[in-house]
């Protein structure tokens, strides 16, 4: 068996095109374009790359984009004051603070300061709680993007056994909630899980988000499984690889995301989708 590639770039492009078409419709009716404020603290190289891609995506779909590049020495109170200002701005539908923040800043307090109806990252406890209660509002971007990838396979996943390896607040935990909502029997594995291999081998759907290069051996993949690899790791030779050993996994799986070009593009596309949703549902 050789897996079909889940083309995240192509699917993300279709999402952005749908959003752009809707923005054009709004403008034609005399309605304002959605607005996204992107806040970057410090000069972390990876964060600058991510923020750049988010700003470009905004321009591409016709959003109003406001950028705030802040010194790494900014105080907690100064950052919270900026968030309050953006919360009160009627032209801004989404507020995004790029994580991680410098060590002296409390990211939990920052996330909780953003109004839930402007929390387009989907990190606020209110939005995660809505997902847990099966009444989702603004959903965390990477998990929501992966659900879009699953939908595009055409496979009916209700009743399947889904295994999520990794339990971060950003990916693993909310992805578990998304899969439960979709009717999967869901197992979450983490650093304290004993016998990881036995769980992975049972997975009809495998999601891996641990940030360790080729952490899951390809031979563990159940024949016919769907594999969603969230990891993006750079080897010493410069090659980018995921958290799953791709060449062997692709011989076992029915569908698999490549790295790069799989899950990553969907995160930004879903952020754009969430910002349009926030504009139309909460602020129009």
From Swiss-Prot:
GO-annotated biological processes: L-histidine biosynthetic process; methionine biosynthetic process; purine nucleotide biosynthetic process; tetrahydrofolate interconversion
InterPro entries from the UniProt entry: Aminoacid_DH-like_N_sf, NAD(P)-bd_dom_sf, THF_DH/CycHdrlase, THF_DH/CycHdrlase_cat_dom, THF_DH/CycHdrlase_CS, THF_DH/CycHdrlase_NAD-bd_dom
Record pathway: One-carbon metabolism; tetrahydrofolate interconversion
Highest taxon in the source lineage: Bacteria
A molecular function (GO) term: methenyltetrahydrofolate cyclohydrolase activity
Reactions it catalyzes: (6R)-5,10-methylene-5,6,7,8-tetrahydrofolate + NADP(+) = (6R)-5,10-methenyltetrahydrofolate + NADPH; (6R)-5,10-methenyltetrahydrofolate + H2O = (6R)-10-formyltetrahydrofolate + H(+)
Positions bound to NADP(+): 166-168, 232
SUPFAM superfamilies: Aminoacid dehydrogenase-like, N-terminal domain, NAD(P)-binding Rossmann-fold domains
Function noted in UniProt: Catalyzes the oxidation of 5,10-methylenetetrahydrofolate to 5,10-methenyltetrahydrofolate and then the hydrolysis of 5,10-methenyltetrahydrofolate to 10-formyltetrahydrofolate.
PANTHER family named among the record's database cross-references: C-1-TETRAHYDROFOLATE SYNTHASE, CYTOPLASMIC (PTHR48099:SF5), C-1-TETRAHYDROFOLATE SYNTHASE, CYTOPLASMIC-RELATED (PTHR48099)
UniProt-recorded name of the protein: Bifunctional protein FolD
Native source species: Tolumonas auensis (strain DSM 9187 / NBRC 110442 / TA 4)
